C-alpha cells in the first residue's frame, strides 16, 4: 500500500460534538450515569485529583456498561451511529475523508470513542478499520473498565503501529487528522 489515511480522532474532528457522554447517557440514562459517578467514590476522587481522564473514563464506562448484555448495548450503538451519521458529522472533514476514499487510500479511524457505536459508524462510512476504546467483556455481558485502556495519545500511535505492522505496511505514508494534543 502506498498511502494509509488515518483519522486521528473522531469527536471534534469528524463530528461536531463529543459522542462518549451522549452514548453513555443513551445506554444508562441519568440514573445510570449518576450511579457510575458515585459507585466508586474514592477511586473517582483520586482520579479527579490527579486529573487522570483515562481512569475517570474507565470508571464511567464500566459503571454504565457493567452487567449489560453486549447485544443490547451494540443495538443501541447501531441506532446511535445512525444519529451521528445523520446529524453530527462535520461537512469539511467528511469531504476530506471521501477525497481519500476516492484516491484509494486505506481509512482507519483511531479514536478514544467507544466501539459499540464507532464500529457501526465506521461500517456506515465505508472505512477500512476502526481502532478505538473497547469496553471490557465477560462472555455476553460487559465487565468493568476498558480492554487495553483508553485509545488516546501514545496509545493511538501504538495501536496504529501494530495495525500497520500486522499488514507489513510500516513504510506507508500516513495522513493523520485531529483536533487536540491527545490526537
What kind of feature is each model-predicted range?
Residues 18, 68, 155:
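Conserved active-site and cofactor/substrate-binding residues in soluble primary-metabolism enzymes
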Residues 1-50:
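Active-site neighborhood of HAD-like aspartate-dependent phosphohydrolases
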Residues 43-71, 129-134:
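Short, compositionally biased "basic patch" segments
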Residues 56-92:
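Metal-dependent phosphoesterase signature
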Residues 1, 75, 82-183:
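C-terminal cap/substrate-recognition subdomain and adjoining C-terminal extension
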Residues 20, 54-58, 139-145:
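Acidic/polar active-site rim loop that often engages polyanionic ligands
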Amino acid at each position: 500500500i502506498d498511502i494509509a489515511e488515518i483519522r486521528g480522532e473522531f469527536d471534534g474532528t469528524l463530528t461536531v460534538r463529543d459522542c462518549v457522554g451522549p452514548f453513555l447517557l443513551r445506554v444508562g440514562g441519568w440514573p445510570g450515569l449518576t450511579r457510575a459517578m458515585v459507585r466508586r467514590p474514592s477511586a473517582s476522587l483520586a482520579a479527579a485529583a490527579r486529573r487522570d481522564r483515562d481512569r475517570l473514563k474507565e470508571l464511567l464506562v464500566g459503571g454504565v456498561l457493567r452487567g449489560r448484555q453486549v447485544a443490547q448495548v451494540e443495538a443501541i450503538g447501531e441506532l446511535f451511529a445512525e444519529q451521528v451519521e445523520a446529524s453530527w458529522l462535520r461537512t469539511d472533514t467528511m469531504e476530506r475523508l471521501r477525497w481519500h476514499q476516492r484516491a484509494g487510500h486505506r481509512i482507519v479511524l483511531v479514536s478514544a470513542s467507544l466501539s459499540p457505536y464507532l464500529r457501526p459508524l465506521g461500517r456506515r462510512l465505508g472505512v477500512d478499520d476502526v481502532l478505538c476504546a473497547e469496553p471490557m467483556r465477560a462472555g455476553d455481558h460487559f465487565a468493568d473498565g476498558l480492554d487495553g485502556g483508553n485509545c488516546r495519545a501514545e496509545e493511538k500511535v501504538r495501536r496504529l503501529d501494530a495495525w500497520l505492522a500486522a499488514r507489513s505496511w510500516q513504510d506507508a505514508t500516513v495522513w493523520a487528522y485531529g483536533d487536540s494534543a491527545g490526537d
